[in-house]
């Protein structure tokens, strides 16, 4: 079976990549999409190439992606597989000054090199534990 460490969320975090129905608070994925989401490995990352996805009252009626209902679904399934992080490209390191996401892929897994814009430039590495 296919398992993933890094999943690029399709269509800018639109509910239509999960289901035909947005859902009031959270999108319920179709069975095969749910199966794919449940094949995430522990410490996996989900990445939404999209604008920020705020959890505000008006976000729930938004027609164009990104959709907060889809974000909630992705985050729920990431938690179910003990995933590490849900990232939105235009929110990192902050929504005012987003920067590219950089991942390192090694035989030990995938790690996100977190960029911080506080004080002097620095890199904080988030590495999954290596088994064995």
Please give the residue ranges for each predicted region.
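Metal-dependent phosphodiesterase/nuclease catalytic metal-binding core
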Residues: 1-42
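C-terminal regulatory/interaction regions
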Residues: 23-24, 34, 39-45, 49-132
């Amino acid at each position: 079976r296919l398992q993933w460490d890094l999943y690029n969320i399709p269509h800018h975090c639109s509910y239509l990549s999960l289901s035909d129905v947005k859902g009031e608070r959270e999108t319920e994925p179709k069975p095969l999409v749910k199966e794919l989401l449940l094949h995430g490995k522990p410490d996996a990352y989900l990445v939404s190439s999209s604008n920020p996805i705020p959890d505000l009252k008006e976000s729930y009626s938004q027609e164009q992606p990104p959709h907060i209902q889809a974000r909630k679904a992705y985050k729920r399934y990431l938690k179910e597989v003990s995933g590490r992080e849900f990232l939105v490209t235009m929110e990192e390191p902050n929504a005012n000054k987003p920067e590219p996401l950089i991942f390192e892929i090694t035989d030990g897994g995938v790690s996100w090199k977190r960029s911080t814009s506080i004080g002097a430039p620095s890199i904080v590495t988030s590495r999954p534990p290596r088994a064995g």
